[in-house]
Amino acid sequence: MMIYAYSELYLNDAQIFLAKAFDYALNDCQQSPDWFAPIFARSSICRQLEMGSPSIISGKAGEEAVKELLESIIPGEDFPSSSFHQGRSPAYWAGWALAYNQWYTRKRFKDIFMRVPLSEILSMYKLYHEMDLTNFVTDLDIRYNAIILETK
């Protein structure tokens, strides 16, 4: 039996949380994916998400969490309200798929983004957004394992 990062009962909420968080950060706030992803991955919000904390997954909107994170990093900046997007953007899909991947593999977002940048994950949208998520997980795992990090 596979042991996942947290109960499957929270998975859908976690996927929606991260999908909306990435959509807001990249589309509404116009943040660069490869600037935003490592900042997100080092945040307490991310650590709580990785553990399946209900206070984050079900208690806070992804957009709200990102706005708080960005305001703590760039004080005084006026970040926009989230806007309605027709359909699902590549950023939304990336958040959705990455939340599933993290739940399934138990890999930390920090480790994922050190090997596979968010911009590369966004480029996978066209191929994988209509496939079963396990195809994305398999490909991401191949890319992840292909990168050997130097250790000191």
Per-range role (PLM):
Residues 4-5, 9-12, 88-106, 116-128:
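A structured, charge-rich N-terminal accessory region that forms the first stable segment of a protein
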Residues 54-86, 90:
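Long, compositionally biased
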Residues 109-116, 143-145:
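Intrinsically disordered, low-complexity tails and linkers flanking structured cores
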Residues 31-38, 77-82, 109-112:
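Short, surface-exposed acidic
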Residues 11, 15-68:
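N-terminal interaction modules that seed assembly of large macromolecular complexes
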Residues 19-24, 42, 71, 92-103:
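Short, hydrophobic/amphipathic alpha-helical patches that form generic packing surfaces
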Residues 122-152:
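Glycine-rich, aromatic-bearing surface loops/beta-hairpins
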